[in-house]
Design a protein with these regions (language model features):
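Active-site SXXK
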Residues: 15-16, 35, 60-88, 162-167, ...
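Short loop/turn microsegments at loop-to-beta-strand junctions
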Residues: 25-27, 290-293
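Hydrophobic (often cysteine-bearing) scaffold residues that line and stabilize catalytic clefts
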Residues: 7-11, 63, 67, 72, ...
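Short, gly/Ser/Thr-rich active-site loops of penicillin-recognizing serine hydrolases
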Residues: 242, 250, 255-260, 271-273, ...
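Short, glycine/proline-biased beta-turn/loop segments that scaffold the active-site neighborhood
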Residues: 86-103, 181
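Short, conserved catalytic-motif segment at the N-terminal edge
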Residues: 4-61, 84, 315
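Short, surface-exposed loop or secondary-structure junction motifs
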Residues: 40, 47, 102-283
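Short, well-ordered beta-strand elements
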Residues: 39-41, 294, 301-310, 314
Length: 339
């Protein structure tokens, strides 16, 4: 096996090219092993418009849907281990006002496990922010909405509901939940990578959540709102590989196929997935719309995060982000070959 520094240089070549060709403003790649070895490389800009700002290792990235795993799934597993909830509890056990005017509604029978593994009838996304910016009114709407039924899909709505459940069980707003160093809901804008010029908000987004629904829900929701530095994300990955974060049964839930290509919260390696070719069978990963991603290969004992601001200054560009993610993961698998 090559050294960590050699491995990351090889892995970073496609990212450097993406920056040089102007497809992505800035990118940070971080590697960490189960033994605690770590290496980080950065290239490009934290902001391209309205002025250029170089990207540094300490910059905050809007993690987007990495919130679902690093924050929401993590907190739910903790509640399970504390005996405060069970994975097969219906949401209505902890959110009694969920569809309270129709006791036979399908939403009242949805379980925590189904939402975590995206096995519900709920839609992928809904433009909730168009209904207003009062968080409590939006939460009430979400809970009483008669959602159109469809086949299971990867759904923000699943995790918005799980975020509400966490608040109900703990009695604490999501925004007040304690976070580890390197993770925050309120980053310094001056130290944050810019995302998109938001026509709805009328400004370039930097240091505030990019996701419109999370913004309208107060800045934090179960599906988005978390920011992290590369080291904050790597610290989280290392804690999972080190087996000290959760019990063995909980770790098995996170790394064992639940339905489709999903474990609880995470996606697991499968042919054609975003983590590239050559991942071990117990590799889990997740993506964020802003251009972020985290992958953890439990068998090899290595994790990597690719953090970009590919939506800056607009999401409507050909960034090639999915191909970049796959190529980066494929190069890692080649560098960390298993015997």
């Amino acid at each position: 096996m090559t050294s960590l520094s050699e491995s990351i240089e090889t892995m970073f070549e496609p990212a450097r090219l993406a920056v040089a060709e102007g497809r992505i403003p800035g990118v940070t790649l971080g590697l960490v092993t189960a033994k605690g070895e770590r290496s980080v490389l950065t290239a490009g800009l934290a902001q391209r418009e309205p002025e250029s700002i170089p990207l540094h290792r300490a910059h905050w990235f809007d993690l987007a849907s990495l919130t679902k795993v690093i924050f929401t799934t993590d907190n739910l597993i903790r509640l399970v281990e504390q005996g405060r909830v069970a994975l097969d509890d219906p949401l209505s056990l902890h959110i009694p006002d969920l569809r309270q005017y129709e006791t036979g509604a399908a939403e009242r029978r949805l379980t925590i496990r189904q939402c975590l593994s995206h096995q519900t009838h709920l839609p992928a996304v809904e433009p909730l922010y168009t209904l207003g910016q009062d968080p409590e009114t939006l939460r009430a709407y979400i809970l009483q909405r008669n959602w159109k039924s469809g086949p299971p899909v990867y759904s923000d709505i699943n995790f918005i509901l799980l975020g509400i459940l966490i608040e109900r069980v703990t009695g604490t707003p999501l925004s007040a939940v304690d976070l580890s160093p390197g993770l925050t809901f309120r980053p310094d804008p001056a130290s944050s990578a810019a995302t998109e010029f938001c026509a709805w908000r009328g400004r370039m987004i930097r240091g505030e959540v990019h996701d419109e629904n999370a913004f309208a829900l107060g800045g934090v929701a179960g599906h988005a709102g978390l920011f992290g530095t590369v080291d904050g994300v790597l610290d989280y990955a290392a804690s999972l590989m080190g087996r000290q974060r959760f019990s063995a049964p909980s770790m098995a839930d996170l790394t064992t196929l639940s339905a489709g290509t999903r474990t609880l919260g995470w996606e697991i390696a499968h042919p054609g997935w975003h983590g590239g070719e050559g991942s071990s069978a117990r590799t889990i990963g997740h993506l964020g719309f802003t251009g972020t991603g985290l992958w953890i290969d439990m068998d090899r004992g290595v994790a990597w995060t690719l953090l970009t601001n590919r939506v800056h200054p607009s999401r409507h560009s050909e960034s090639g982000i999915m191909a970049l993610r796959r190529e980066t993961g494929t190069r890692l698998a080649a560098a960390f070959k298993q015997d």
